[in-house]
């Protein structure tokens, strides 16, 4: 989770070098304890021009509706004007039935609270299952586990061959830097299956890789 300090440094860097920040906040409502600070909130707190930040939201994670393809962009009025013009020429129109469904889902917060509780329950299960694993950390938000392994690709292949559990090597989601590849020593596990299936999958991962 990006902290207030992280946002302040990034915004200061953007102001110094005159670039815009595009923030994907589709996971922002799936948190465990404390709501994370949003990019626009951070910009206001820093006294930054809201045109410096462009924020994207979606129903895909918030409401578990990835197939609906419904979202919105928030920024300053100049950016929004340009995005509207781009949409007019290059964007696909959203069918009216989808707009009506989206309107109802966006206006309802009860299911979002329930969604957070569901993931909290799964993370509690994960914390118990991986309690004895060194370097295991429980995330503050989202619905992914990043599990420490020696080699992400080898671990993912071993899991698939021996248990039928599919995970993603962390290196597939990271970019190497001078210190190496920060994702190579991890696998990413999505906690999106039903509770009992998730418990079974996590137990198989533990028994295959850590015992």
Regions found by a protein language model. Give the residues of each.
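PLP-dependent class I/II
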Residues: 1-211
């Amino acid at each position: 989770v990006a902290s207030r300090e992280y946002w302040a440094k990034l915004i200061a860097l953007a102001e110094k070098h005159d670039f815009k920040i595009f923030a994907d906040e589709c996971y922002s409502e799936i948190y465990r304890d404390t709501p994370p600070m949003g990019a626009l909130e951070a910009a206001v707190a820093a006294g930054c021009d809201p045109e410096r930040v462009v924020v994207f939201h979606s129903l895909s994670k918030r409401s578990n509706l990835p197939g609906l393809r419904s979202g919105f962009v928030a920024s300053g009025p100049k950016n929004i004007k340009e995005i509207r013009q781009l949409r007019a020429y290059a964007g696909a129109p959203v069918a009216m039935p989808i707009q009506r469904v989206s309107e109802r889902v966006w206006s309802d917060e009860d299911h979002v609270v329930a969604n957070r509780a569901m993931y909290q329950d799964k993370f509690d299960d994960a914390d118990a299952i991986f309690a004895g694993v060194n370097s295991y950390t429980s995330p503050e938000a989202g619905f992914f586990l990043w599990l420490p392994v020696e080699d992400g690709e080898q671990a993912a292949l071993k899991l698939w061959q021996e248990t039928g559990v599919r995970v993603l090597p962390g290196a597939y989601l990271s970019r190497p830097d001078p210190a190496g590849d920060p994702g190579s020593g991890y696998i990413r596990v999505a906690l999106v299956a039903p509770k009992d299936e998730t418990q079974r999958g996590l137990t198989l991962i533990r028994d295959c890789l850590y015992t």
